[in-house]
Amino acid sequence: MRKFLYRFLLFSLLPLLTFLVLEIRIRTKHTQLFQEEKLEQAFRHKAGAYQWVNTIKHPKKVFLLGSSSIKYGLSCRELNRLAADSLAFINLAADARDPIETYFILKQLDLSAVSAMYMGIDPWIYTRNYYRNRHQYLLLDLPFTKALRYSKDYDLRLFAKRYKALFHFPDPDHPAAILQTSIPADFGSVALTKKPVNFNDPVSKKFRLNEYGWSELQFTYLQKIVSLCQEKGIAFTAFYPPRRMDFINDYESNCRDIQASFLAQLQKSGFTKQIKSSILSLQPGNDSLFADAYHLNKAGQETYSRYFFSFVQEN
């Protein structure tokens, strides 16, 4: 009986010891794990979806960067029509896209004919709370106690994903992008014809800074995008996309401290650009142009594209 209990104890301790060794490695090797070369291994396959960008031969390309608010908020077809072919607008935004993924996509594209980049800023994208929408490699950035909470709140598979990422196993939830060489009808923009189902909560609940905090990595890679533009002689402008009035009221009432903290994080990372406000958000009676508090509908996309083109001309 004693031998059985002894063997059982040894057998039980083996997974626990393995768990402890892996977590100690993640904690002590954090800096090495998040070197640019390491992150590039996780995100290098994302640019395949944008190989069509290199086939556009135009001396003045303008890249639109950001998440879903930019993907659905601006029509490149309308912008190119307004520009009368003097500029070629191209939308590289995607649902929940962050600065890290954006940076590695940009690094793999031909930037020689890009004259300007405009990046929409959604502050909640810069939180660790949003890691649930990211490649599993970013789960290595969560301290152990936050990883435990995340596992309970969002994904019981967290630690399995975390250890797979540690050894660079593929992320089945974020497979390599399919090579795309055909130019999309709206140059990467998409019109939103139905109401999104995952944006019903107030904006003040999207951050969860007390539980997970900001992602310093996102701020670092935002600044890397700025530096890349400076290196290539490309003008860079950051701006806030338009919001519905209920969003604006909620943000002003409940997110003052969050916004102040966000701006402090930007400054800490070396980001000194002024983020331009959205002109459309200031116009009265425009709630009908939104599919929800964050995203413009098709009519809103066309309207905002005209405002945005005027903004580009003035800046």
Model-predicted segments: where are they?
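Hydrophobic membrane-insertion alpha-helices, especially the h-region
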Residues: Y6-R27
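Alpha-helical transmembrane signal-anchor/signal-peptide segments
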Residues: I26-A47
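Active-site segments of SGNH/GDSL-like serine hydrolases
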Residues: A191, V226-Y251
